[in-house]
């Protein structure tokens, strides 16, 4: 806000200390997170985020390219899931799932790609629209139904996929697929790197 020239504002915090799910604490004298929220490396549409990271000293230009402070980067595998009595890399259940589940993963990947090709998704989303460029009709249709309803309409009823999509909604939006719009659910993937079914090539 300050960089945008806004000087009069009030920041409200629900808790006694600021930070939300990015707040940290101390355990046995060692700093640790109490929650976790990570930023994907910002793309060209997220200029305000880029500026903030630069102001915080988390990125700088080296030989004409942006370089991020390695101390603050998370490297793969970033997340793991305990399923079927064992750990697997990533949160999408793949270990021990059947062919029908994998087929639904591939179908969802195609649906996300179709929506991405129909109209652009970006992060932050507000960079997409203005009075001359309103939300695309295909996006408005998605925004009019819940992600759960859209998923059901598409025949995506596999319990592993349903769990994963609901988790993604709760993680990013604080509400499950029955409360989040289909546009928001698809935006979770389309504004990043899409959705890639296991075993499928990544462009």
List the predicted regions and their residue ranges.
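Glycine-centered flexibility sites
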Residues: 19-20, 35, 174
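Dinucleotide-binding Rossmann-like beta1-alpha1 core, especially the glycine-rich loop
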Residues: 30-118
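Glycine-rich FAD pyrophosphate-binding loop
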Residues: 2-27
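Active-site/ligand-binding neighborhood in enzyme catalytic cores
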Residues: 117, 123-203
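Short, solvent-exposed loop/turn segments at secondary-structure junctions
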Residues: 16-17, 87-88, 169-171
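Short coil/loop linkers at secondary-structure junctions
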Residues: 7, 57-59, 155-159
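Short, solvent-exposed loop/turn and secondary-structure capping segments
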Residues: 21-24, 50, 92-93, 180-181
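Solvent-exposed, polar/charged alpha-helical surfaces in well-ordered, non-transmembrane soluble domains
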Residues: 3, 47-51, 149
């Amino acid at each position: 806000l300050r960089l945008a020239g806004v000087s009069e504002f009030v920041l409200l915090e629900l808790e006694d200390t600021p930070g939300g799910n990015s707040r940290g604490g101390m355990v046995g004298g060692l700093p640790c997170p109490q929650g976790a929220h990570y930023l994907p490396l910002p793309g060209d549409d997220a200029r305000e985020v880029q500026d903030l990271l630069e102001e915080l000293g988390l990125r700088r230009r080296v030989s004409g390219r942006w370089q991020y402070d390695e101390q603050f980067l998370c490297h793969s595998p970033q997340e793991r899931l305990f399923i079927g009595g064992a750990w697997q890399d990533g949160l999408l259940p793949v270990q021990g799932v059947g062919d029908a589940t994998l087929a639904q993963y591939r179908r969802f990947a195609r649906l996300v790609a179709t929506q991405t090709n129909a109209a652009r998704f970006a992060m932050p989303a507000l960079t997409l629209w203005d009075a001359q460029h309103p939300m695309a009709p295909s996006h408005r249709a998605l925004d009019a139904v819940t992600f759960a309803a859209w998923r059901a309409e598409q025949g995506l009823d596999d319990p592993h996929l349903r769990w994963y999509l609901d988790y993604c909604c709760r993680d990013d939006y604080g509400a499950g697929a029955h409360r989040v719009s289909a546009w928001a659910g698809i935006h979770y993937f389309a504004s990043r790197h899409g959705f890639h079914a296991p075993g499928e090539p990544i462009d």
